[in-house]
UniProtKB/Swiss-Prot annotation:
Chemical reaction(s) catalysed: (2S)-4-acetamido-2-aminobutanoate = L-ectoine + H2O
Recorded name of the encoding gene: ectC
Pathway: Amine and polyamine biosynthesis; ectoine biosynthesis; L-ectoine from L-aspartate 4-semialdehyde: step 3/3
Entry's EC annotation: 4.2.1.108
Family: Belongs to the ectoine synthase family.
The protein, known as: L-ectoine synthase
Pfam families, sorted: Ectoine_synth
Length: 134
């Protein structure tokens, strides 16, 4: 069994901060469970375009609100606490937080924590062997 708190993540290489967001990667590929799990805060007033060509992502809002636009269809959705969106078709999308937007995210395949968004807003498909987490 793995037990972790956000305090365990803060200030480590699993605590990723950019101009638009902060993502604390709580479960990663090295944990060997087939998915990764993150708590991410996207900052109010920012705009972030992403395209997970190599991953499926589920995003569940627990605080704040944002508009999410499917860049392929032009559809825009208001995401509020208790609402999720699932990028099951690898959709290019843009997130525009109206307030600080706190979400819980699940990625499959799992990310390693070393990924950075490329020029298309995508993560490369990296692999990492599971390590002993005892």
């Amino acid at each position: 069994m793995i037990v972790r708190s956000l305090d365990d993540i803060n200030g480590t290489d699993a605590d990723v901060v950019t101009e638009n967001w902060r993502s604390r990667r709580i479960v990663l590929a090295r944990d060997g469970v087939g998915f990764s799990f993150h708590e991410t805060v996207l900052y109010a007033g920012t705009e972030t375009s992403m395209w997970y060509a190599n991953h499926i992502e589920l995003v569940h809002c627990i605080e704040g609100e944002a508009e999410v636009t499917n860049d392929e269809t032009g559809e825009t959705f208001l995401i509020t606490p208790g609402t999720l969106y699932l990028l099951n078709g690898h959709e290019r999308h843009t997130v525009r937080p109206k307030t600080d937007f706190r979400v819980l995210c699940v990625f499959t395949p799992p990310v390693t924590g070393r990924e950075v968004h490329d020029e298309n807003g995508s993560y490369p498909l990296l692999t990492e062997d599971a390590t002993d987490t005892d």
